Amino acid sequence: FRSAGQRCSALRCLYVQEDISEKLIKMLKGAMNELVVSDPWLLSTDVGPVIDAAAHKTIADHITQAEAEGRLIHTLQSPSTGTFISPAVIRVNGIADMTREIFGPVLHIATFKANDLDKVIDEINATGYGLTFGLHTRIDDRVQTIVEKIEAGNIYVNRDQIGAVVGSQPFGGEGLSGTGPKAGGPYYLPRFTAPKAAPIAEAWTTDADIAALTKTLKAKSHAMPNAPTDLPGPTGESNRHSTRARGPILCMGPSEAATKAQVAAVTALGGTPVGINGKIDPSALATLPNLAGVIWWGDTDTGRAIEQALSDRTGPITALITSYPDAAHVLHERHVCIDTTAAGGNAALLAEVGKA
């Protein structure tokens, strides 16, 4: 509800294990009742207005519909003037019920059985969006399992998921939530210095085998994550940045020499290259499976046609790369922030105390 829910990483859907759902919802209602919805100039205000009248109508209509369907769990009174929306909690079956993002102080709650956890993760990943994800648990095995499976750029464990700190928590999503590089991450500045593509002497004169190419793309699996890097942060908090290869990067030349250079560049960066052996009609790129990116160093008109075909794809955003690729083009970045105090303390710090 902070910033009236108008932050990209604000919690939109909360999954609660059904064993504790009744108690948690009771506590949530009590906390909401303490919130003050009022003029943001006042120090006592917790929740201010939403950005404009159009946003107000969209959010208000969503809450009204939920109330009519008997799914409104709790809300507060709003000021009678202005574009204020009081915090609201709405019951849903799962994140699939949310056909669009409600960018305001609205929390959707779904419950799940303990043995349905894998199903919950699959539901979240199936949306295609992956900016921030939060997890609260004292079970270390559960943390490891979920962190390995969830497809989100920033993961927060046992702490809130708002307010990435520059230098400690590089910020950015994946899938439909971003193509990288992460803001404040190790690949951010290099993106501004990417070298131009090599000049092309001779383009392909034969057509590529689309059937064979499709088979190759389907066979490429997601790689395991690389060793994480520890980032600085306050005592009691762990911040780790890691990378893993994206899906296949299609290297389209437009010549044999250019394709070989593209494959070599992607390989050197730790990515998964797939080179072609002839020309491809750009329209085919709209349906080729598993594409994470396309490299093209040829003419501008063909480049525009490729870009149009990629924009017609469903699922994650597929980038067109017209320069030499950089690490962010071929690698997913993940950041995991853990409040170690919530799980018994900072093991590294305790070990140092033992040496004193």
Feature roles, as predicted:
Residues G70:
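Glycine-centered, phosphate/nucleic-acid-interacting loop/turn motifs that mediate DNA/RNA or nucleotide
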Residues I73-Q77:
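Diglycine-centered glycine-rich loop/turn motifs
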